[in-house]
């Protein structure tokens, strides 16, 4: 990413907000692609930082050309000077939580951590923090809270997707 370039991300909002703040400070343009189920408040927050927000339909498969993943990927292909942070497949996501968030939680709790609960999201927070906490105390329980309709339920209990994923509210 070079000065004046464009940061692109498929997001449900939280990563987008962080990227939008940094982009505004550094002078980058940013484009965030999100499903239509995301609240207007999150969209407005991204726009307040100068981001362009592209809305896609919720009820499409991830590899459908209309999905927020595919629209973001395509946008990068056709936009010179753009960079796709790709939070869902970027190994730096979990690595940074392993290096920063995990130690912060451990230190602030003075090592008295029994259970860590996080939403699944991209998996970066729960896997990075979980790895760190387990390295400090193998008995720490790591709990994933995910909404009804998520494919993770079937994968966890049956090691396969048995029910067709469907849309769920994120807020």
Task: Identify the role of each PLM range.
Residues 58-66, 90-171:
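Glycine-rich phosphate/pyrophosphate-binding loop at beta-loop-alpha junctions
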Residues 1-6:
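Helix-rich "cap/lid" substructures immediately adjacent to catalytic or cofactor-binding pockets
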Residues 50-51, 80-81, 138:
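A short helix-to-beta-strand connector/capping loop
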Residues 8, 17-75, 148, 152-165:
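Active-site-proximal loop->helix
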